[in-house]
A protein has these predicted regions:
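Hydrophobic secondary-structure segments that place a key small or acidic residue at a functional site
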Residues: 81, 89-95, 107-165, 175
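Transmembrane alpha-helical interface segments in multi-pass membrane proteins
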Residues: 234, 255-301, 319, 323, ...
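Peri-transmembrane interface segments
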Residues: 31, 194-240, 249-254, 259-260, ...
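Hydrophobic alpha-helical transmembrane segments of multi-pass inner-membrane transport and secretion
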Residues: 1-27, 221-259, 279-288, 330
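C-terminal membrane-exit region of the final transmembrane helix in multipass inner-membrane proteins
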Residues: 313-351
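Hydrophobic alpha-helical transmembrane segments
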Residues: 3-7, 291, 314-322
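A short beta-strand structural signal in non-transmembrane regions
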Residues: 42, 126-127, 148-153, 174-200, ...
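Hydrophobic, regular-secondary-structure patches
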Residues: 11, 15-90, 194-198, 204
Length: 351
């Protein structure tokens, strides 16, 4: 029973570490996938756009859409407006016909396209998380919206409304957040970007691959630091659990330790036994923590599939194991040294 409890207490910080890393990777991968789902080859943003991962704010005139549409090799230029409602969720205003032509169309699970100004399209993740269905009315941005359709996920946003309607609500008439360009041939991307930067040197212009590569852990303030704080907490918990568990084990096995000492067991041999048992506890706790991280992913995907995404990151499994084993080894030192220095006569007399 003591060992099972130790496995659990060691497994919990392992689960926390793997879950935090999985959330970071999952949300980054989801954002990258949805950006690629737009079908664009190039993204143009406003001159006062913030970090590369911030897609909200109306900073571009719609006139640029027509200007960019006329550029060489540009097959389609589409402006969108993003409005943050509840991080990390945004409402995206689109010209439905042009956006779906660029993105390859929406796959409707239920309902259909916009028909009225207050119509809203949501993807299946938002539908599952908020329990909304085609035909329902929901409140967002202090007004009612009619959910006219539910689509498959992966097309830029979880929530879509008519561009003109969102511009009016956002007091951004004639403005968009970013402009997506689809080229006649993706191989022309570098040449088109170079030409555009010569004409619009003050505007951030990215290829889709460049933009998605910017959506990473290094560009999200505080994530790396917070991850290592959690790792540090995991080390402390693992050390304390193993130290207490092995200390109790040594107390319970005082007589057995005395027998080993009387049979010629060296201090190093006794210490090695204690450390080995601690390492086994560490391995077992890590395996349990990995298993529980799959449970955490299932729970997150079931409860909040639109707001939070979690990925399983196997590359962190050996890192978690190394952290746990190091904690176990250090945690076993004091109990092991105490056991190694037991007087065999006192140990055999212990009841």
């Amino acid at each position: 029973m003591r060992s099972l409890l130790s496995f659990l207490l060691i497994g919990v910080p392992v689960t926390l570490i793997l879950t935090l890393v999985g959330l970071t990777h999952g949300m980054i991968e989801d954002s990258q996938q949805r950006q690629r789902g737009s079908g664009a080859d190039i993204v143009v943003r406003g001159t006062n756009a913030a970090a590369a991962i911030n897609f909200s704010g109306a900073t571009l005139s719609e006139k640029f859409v027509d200007f960019l549409q006329k550029q060489s090799h540009v097959e389609m230029a589409v402006g969108v407006l993003s409005h943050n409602i509840q991080l990390p969720l945004t409402v995206t205003g689109i010209d439905l016909e042009r956006f779906t032509a660029m993105a390859g169309g929406f796959t409707y699970i239920a309902g259909g396209p916009f028909r009225k100004p207050n119509d809203m399209i949501v993807d299946r993740y938002y539908s599952a998380e908020r329990h909304v269905h085609a035909g329902d009315t929901i409140m967002l941005m202090n007004r009612p919206w009619h959910v006219c359709g539910v689509i498959e996920a992966g097309k830029l946003s979880h929530i879509f409304v008519e561009l003109k309607v969102l511009q009016e609500l956002d007091s951004s008439t004639g403005k968009v957040s970013q402009i997506f360009l689809k080229l006649d041939n993706p191989s022309n991307t570098a040449a088109v970007i170079q030409a555009l930067k010569e004409k619009l040197p003050e505007y951030p212009i990215y290829s889709m691959e460049e933009l998605t590569s910017m959506i990473n852990v290094n560009n999200i303030a505080g994530v790396k630091e917070f991850t290592w704080v959690v790792v540090g907490i995991g080390v402390v918990i693992g050390f304390a659990v193993v130290c207490l568990s092995m200390y109790m084990a040594v107390l319970q096995r005082t007589r057995e330790i005395g027998i080993l000492k009387s049979l010629g067991g060296s201090n190093g041999f006794i210490l090695g036994i204690v450390v080995m048992e601690a390492m086994l506890l560490g391995v077992g706790g890590t395996l349990l923590g990995i298993a529980m991280s799959f449970g955490a992913k299932w729970l997150i995907h079931t409860l909040v599939p639109a707001s939070i995404q979690m990925a399983i990151v196997p590359v962190w499994w050996p890192i978690a194991l190394s952290i746990t084993l190091a904690s176990a080894a250090f945690g076993a030192l004091y109990p092991g040294l105490r056991a190694a220095h037991h007087d065999p006569i006192e140990a055999l007399a212990y009841e």
